[in-house]
Amino acid sequence: MVSTRGHPQEFPEPDLTPSRATPSRARKGKWAHTPSNLTIIWLLISLPLVAWDTGYVMLRPHSMPGGSLHWPIWVPYDLYGQVDYIYGWKAFHEKNGFTAAQGFLNIIESLMYLYYLYILYAFGAQSRAQGRGAPKTSTAGFLGQQRYVDGQKGALAALVAFSAAVMTVSKTLLYWMNEYYSGFENIGHNSLMDLIFLWIIPNGAWLVLPSYMIYVTGSEILQGLTIVAGGATASSDDTALVKTE
């Protein structure tokens, strides 16, 4: 006959509560799109200029010299059409479709930027923190500060801005490469100084600032995907995408 041994106390109940996640698996924070005011100001300046340019292109020949719509809105294009023949009578008479095709893409690009600004102002908030990729607020002041949009709207804003900026840079590079591979057919007649101040500098702005936007929004998208994938990210601070709650 087998006897059972008595125990001085009962066995403890098993702990069924989930264990707390380790710091490497859980972090207190959230992703956010944090464009600097520099980005926003660039868009507020460039969009009217692009609309002006697109209007000239799509309303030719009425917007060209001698046309009923030329004065006073598009008078400066009298000079620019002599600097760059792609905007002048030469390309128009030759039925060169590049100018109008680029103007059509300008419309799509501008609508994307307008939708982006709508998201920023309808769902975002201004912050004194430094925007990602922006100069320090101690030196740049307001230009370096950010607008903050988190959640799905922030992700959508970053995606739209990245796509539009890639479109801007690609379209501008195509414009430059078209000249290079045609032997500078439309701008080769200019002096070096005229070329620098009337063509390279004005058009170069649409390479520099959108490239900055690609860097900023691309970094944000990459970091957001890294967070979702469970990868390590930099610790959060005022300029990071992961905002501490």
Stretch-by-stretch model annotation:
Residues N190-E245:
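Terminal transmembrane helical module of multi-pass membrane proteins
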Residues A51-D53, V169, I214:
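Hydrophobic residues within the alpha-helical transmembrane core of Major Facilitator Superfamily
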Residues T34-S46, A129-V166:
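Interfacial segments of alpha-helical transmembrane regions
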Residues K30-S110:
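N-terminal helical submodule of small eukaryotic multi-pass membrane proteins
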Residues S138-A140, T168-P202:
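Juxtamembrane loop segments immediately following a transmembrane helix
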